[in-house]
């Protein structure tokens, strides 16, 4: 369940990240820890760069100033800024560009042509379709039915 403050916190952090040259990937507020932890995952807008310690530090310092200014989070908390690492789920436009040619598994609901799960090599994604290569044959899956696209180690 998403913490109720996350939408406000994201609307504060997203433009700040962009101004510094980063993409806000995810923000999670772990209130079951004492003190609570606000985890912010960023990555550079430049797809040829990896997230560095200096990137995390710059975002942390800038975000800390803004969070103190708006005072949305009551009490003490820990701000943790890091890289999302490598996730096997593809969600952003950038993911679909970076992982073009990689083996993926696509889950659909409703199924397409009687299949709910398709495996192949990613060719790309546009507004209407996710394109895969299945043993050299191009298949275009309806994007509206795609529930998840994950990196895979095998293709059938």
Swiss-Prot record:
Pfam families xref list: DUF150_C, RimP_N
GO terms in the biological process aspect are: ribosomal small subunit assembly; translation
The family line of this record is: Belongs to the RimP family.
Q: Where in the cell is it found?
A: Cytoplasm
Q: Which organism is it from?
A: Synechococcus sp. (strain JA-2-3B'a(2-13)) (Cyanobacteria bacterium Yellowstone B-Prime)
Q: Which GO terms describe its cellular component?
A: cytosol
Task: State the function annotated in the UniProt record.
Answer: Required for maturation of 30S ribosomal subunits.
UniProt keyword list: Cytoplasm, Ribosome biogenesis
Which branch of life, at top level?
Bacteria
Q: What is its main location?
A: cytoplasm
What is the protein named?
Ribosome maturation factor RimP
